[in-house]
C-alpha cells in the first residue's frame, strides 16, 4: 500500500469526521478536499462514502446508552415513538435518493456546484436564525411524527452536495419548533439509518472498484473519521447549548465564495466533472 494513499485516506477521514455532523456539508468538503489531493477517481468516490461508517459508529458510541435503552424498551410507547419518528424522517430522502442519485452525482458532485450550495445553504441558515422561534419541543422524546416528517422533507435538500445533511435536518427541526439541542440530537440519530443505508448501498453498487489491497486505506480513513467525529459531536452539542448557527452560516458563505473566486481567477484549477 502506497504511503501517500494512506496519508490521503487519513486526511480525508479527518475531514469526514469533523464535518459530517456540523451544518457545513461533509460531502462538499470531501469533494473539494479530494479534488485538491487529486483523489477523485471512481475508487475515491466509493472511499468517501465508505468512511462514513466510522462517523456513524461514533454516533452509536456517543449515544450508546440511549440506543441500548431503546432496544431494551422495545414495545413501550416511548421507544416505539422514537423509532417511528426515525422511520418517518428517513423515508423521504431514501425514496428520492434511490430515484435520482445517479443524476445528482453526474451533474452536481463537482467543486463548483458544491460551492454554490455552500453559499446558498449559508444564506438559508442566516434566514432561519433570524426568524422568530417558537419552541414546542425541548427534548427528542417529545417529538411527534409531524415534526419528524417535516425534518425528513428538509433532509431531501441534502441530496444536493454542499447543502449538508445535518444542516438541512437541523434547520428543518428549528422551523418545526424544536430547540437547537433537540434538533441537533435528532439529526445525529437520523444519521444512523440514512448513512448506514447510503454507505452499504453505494459500496455494494460499486464493489467492482474495491480490492483487498485497499483494505488499509479504508481502515485508516474510517478510524480517523470515527475519532474526529466523536470530538466534533461532543463539541457541537456543547456549542449549540449556548449559541446559534450563525457562525456556521458565515463559514459556509466564506468558504463557498473562496472556491468560486479561486475558480474565476484561475488560482486553483478545480475540476468541472
UniProtKB/Swiss-Prot annotation:
Transmembrane feature ranges: 4-24, 43-63, 82-102, 108-128, 183-203, 217-237, 253-273
One Gene Ontology molecular-function label: undecaprenyl-diphosphatase activity
Gene Ontology cellular component terms for the protein in this record: plasma membrane
Subcellular location: Cell inner membrane
Keyword Membrane tagged: yes
Catalytic activity from the UniProt record: di-trans,octa-cis-undecaprenyl diphosphate + H2O = di-trans,octa-cis-undecaprenyl phosphate + phosphate + H(+)
Membrane topology, as annotated: Multi-pass membrane protein
Cell membrane in keyword set: yes
Cited InterPro entries: UppP
E.C. numbers: 3.6.1.27
One Gene Ontology biological process: response to antibiotic
UniProt miscellaneous comment: Bacitracin is thought to be involved in the inhibition of peptidoglycan synthesis by sequestering undecaprenyl diphosphate, thereby reducing the pool of lipid carrier available.
Family of the protein in this entry: Belongs to the UppP family.
Function field: Catalyzes the dephosphorylation of undecaprenyl diphosphate (UPP). Confers resistance to bacitracin.
HAMAP family recorded: Undec_diphosphatase
Name of the protein in question: Undecaprenyl-diphosphatase
Originating species: Nitrosomonas eutropha (strain DSM 101675 / C91 / Nm57)
